[in-house]
A protein has these predicted regions:
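Conserved structural motif at the start of ABC-family nucleotide-binding domains
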Residues: 3-5, 18, 72
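The feature captures the beta-strand-to-loop junction immediately N-terminal to the Walker
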Residues: 31-36
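Helix-to-loop junction immediately C-terminal to a conserved catalytic motif
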Residues: 49
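Conserved ABC transporter NBD signature motif
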Residues: 57-71, 210-212
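Catalytic Walker B motif of ABC-type/P-loop ATPase nucleotide-binding domains
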Residues: 153-157, 162
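Helix N-cap at the start of a conserved alpha-helix in ABC-type nucleotide-binding domains
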Residues: 164-166
Length: 236
């Protein structure tokens, strides 16, 4: 399966943020989307998720049936600021999400099995979500994505609110889940991108570009990425 972006453009008033971006993302990979602050990473995610309308270009999915438009069921979008219903308990939310996704998930697990996947403590599972920490709410967002099982995951800096141990646990979980899925992970933390992602994609000057490590060491590759991000004339 591929997510195909062709000449995608998006502007706000007089400012063009995405400038003819084209790229093919393939399933089975975790892509690290890097870019400087204001580069348009969240805008790109919102365009893919159809929260924003394209000015021009196309976003398509290519699978065994050929190319087609993206359906809302294809995408799971985890925002940097979690949006979850505070008036429910964690268990109530998981049960509700299981119920509405029952038909498309053949191997549905119990609520506690899902909680175990993201290491939410037993004593927190029946608490109101309004009493959860920011990191716990982010865990719930990740869990809802796991349950709904979309083909494409858009993760907008979801690990930045976790402590070091939990972030490492979530990284290992994502690595296990990437098979048959396409995960695009937006972050500004270089170490996180290099330790988690299979491929690094830069969003710079409104366009997407794959950076390949080749024979470079990790330190050399990191220095190269920083150089490209800083160099306003690179590739022009």
């Amino acid at each position: 399966m591929k997510l195909i972006l062709e000449n995608v453009e998006k502007s706000f008033d007089e400012k063009q943020v995405i400038k003819g971006a084209s790229f093919e993302f393939e399933s089975g990979n975790i892509y690290g989307l890097l870019g400087r602050n204001g580069a348009g990473k969240t805008t790109l995610f919102n365009v893919i998720n159809e929260d924003l309308t394209l000015d021009s270009g196309s976003v398509k999915l290519s699978d065994e049936g050929g190319e087609r438009a993206i359906d809302s069921d294809d995408i799971g979008y985890v925002l940097s600021t979690p949006i979850v219903p505070d008036f429910l308990t964690g268990r109530e939310l998981i049960k509700f999400f299981k119920d509405i996704n029952m038909k498309k998930i053949p191997d549905m697990k119990s609520e506690d099995e899902y909680f175990d996947m993201v290491d939410i403590a037993v004593e927190d599972r029946d608490r109101l979500i309004k009493d959860y920490s920011h990191g716990m709410k982010n865990k719930m967002m990740m869990l809802l994505t796991i349950i709904s099982n979309p083909a494409i995951w858009l993760l907008d800096e979801p690990l930045t609110s976790f402590d070091v141990v939990v972030a490492d646990e979530m990284k290992e979980l994502l690595k296990k889940l990437k098979r048959d899925r396409l995960i695009i992970f937006s972050t500004h933390i270089m170490e996180l991108a290099l330790s988690l992602c299979d491929k690094i994609v830069l969003l710079k000057d409104g366009k997407l570009r794959l950076l390949e490590q080749g024979e470079m060491s990790r330190e050399e590759f990191e220095a190269y990425i920083i150089k490209v991000l800083k160099d306003e004339t690179e590739g022009e």
